[in-house]
């Protein structure tokens, strides 16, 4: 839940790793409900893309898209194509959520097609003599099992996979793609009582509304400071936006050296830490008596070591890092 809140507040991409039946898909489906309402400009742009893909429905106006293509989808289905070119799933998720379940089961060209839009928010389609560019600013949520049988690390069921099989399975996802993902969440096996009738849903609606208010307050804080969510900060602006304390800088420098992180990964950790700090700021702000939301007058403090420490834990276990 905490990582989902951070992802929503900062527009960060999210990788969920865990055995089957642990609720990875349910978590992904909750994300759109935590995101801020679409602005008129966002709704217009998303509707225009959907119209080009012949997938516009008036009843969905203003609702953030949630696209969940099957793992058998081709690179063309994800990216788009045709004559004339039409947007694929990547663009149809513009201003919304793209959920890729069973991530290693997608073919390699399809996965590699994600790299451009994750960096730029746009996708270029070149087919024969035609070339088209579509917006593709989506929030990626990906899910995978930890191994081919799905039970590596499952205390309730033994894993049948050899180390070599696990390495091959995880190796289907390239290092450059993994490096572009922000948050890793290991989703553990839950006891059956967790999913008993009424146990999950009793306070879930109220809890979601509370988290959504914090997310919106943190987004407003970031927007007022830099005109964009934290995940969309360019590398040159990341450190100044973080405004880190000396303790935060020292902690991240030590972690980066020990874990061999690249400059791209460092920037991602600073962005995550900035979001953690924003959530901490709005969490301590006095609530508006009318709405219950955090007031917009809360100051934006620096990123401290405690914020960096939380951000590090979402990166240190990424496959290949």
Where are these regions (language model features)?
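Conserved alpha-helical scaffold flanking the Walker A/P-loop in AAA+ ATPase domains
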Residues: 5, 59-65, 70-98, 130-131
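Conserved inter-motif catalytic segment of the P-loop NTP-binding fold
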Residues: 42-74, 81-82, 233-239, 243-246, ...
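Walker B catalytic acidic pair
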Residues: 95, 101-102, 113
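N-terminal pre-P-loop "Q-motif" helix
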Residues: 1-3
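Basic, amphipathic alpha-helical bundle interface domains used for macromolecular binding and assembly
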Residues: 85, 108-321
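Walker A/P-loop
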Residues: 14-58, 120
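Pre-Walker A (Motif I) flank of P-loop NTPase domains
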Residues: 10-15, 94-96
């Amino acid at each position: 839940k905490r990582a989902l809140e951070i992802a929503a507040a900062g527009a960060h991409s999210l990788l969920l790793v865990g055995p089957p039946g642990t609720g990875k898909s349910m978590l992904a489906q909750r994300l759109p409900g935590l995101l801020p309402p679409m602005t008129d400009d966002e709704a217009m742009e998303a509707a225009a893309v959907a119209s080009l893909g012949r997938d516009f429905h008036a009843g969905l106006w203003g609702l953030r898209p949630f696209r969940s293509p099957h793992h058998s989808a081709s690179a063309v289905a994800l990216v788009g194509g045709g004559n004339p070119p039409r947007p694929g799933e990547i663009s149809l998720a513009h201003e919304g959520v793209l959920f890729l379940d069973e991530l290693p089961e997608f073919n390699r060209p399809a996965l590699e097609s994600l790299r451009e839009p994750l960096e730029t928010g746009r996708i270029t389609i070149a087919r024969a003599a035609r070339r088209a560019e579509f917006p593709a600013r989506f929030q990626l949520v990906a899910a995978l099992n930890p191994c081919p049988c799905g039970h590596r690390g499952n205390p309730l069921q033994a894993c049948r996979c050899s180390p070599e099989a696990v390495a091959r399975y995880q190796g289907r996802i390239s290092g450059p793609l993994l490096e572009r993902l922000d948050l890793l969440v290991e989703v553990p096996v839950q006891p059956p009582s967790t999913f008993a009738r009424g146990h999950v849903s009793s306070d879930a609606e109220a809890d979601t509304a509370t988290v959504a208010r914090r997310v919106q307050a943190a987004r407003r804080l970031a927007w007022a400071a830099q005109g964009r969510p934290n995940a969309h900060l360019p590398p040159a602006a990341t450190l100044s936006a973080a405004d880190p304390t000396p303790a935060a800088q020292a902690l991240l420098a030590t972690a980066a050296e020990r874990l061999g992180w690249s400059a791209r990964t460092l920037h991602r950790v600073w962005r995550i830490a900035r979001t953690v700090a924003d959530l901490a700021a709005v969490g301590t702000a006095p609530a508006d008596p009318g709405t219950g939301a955090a007031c917009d007058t809360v100051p934006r403090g620096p990123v401290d070591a405690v914020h960096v420490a939380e951000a590090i834990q979402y990166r240190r276990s990424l496959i290949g890092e």
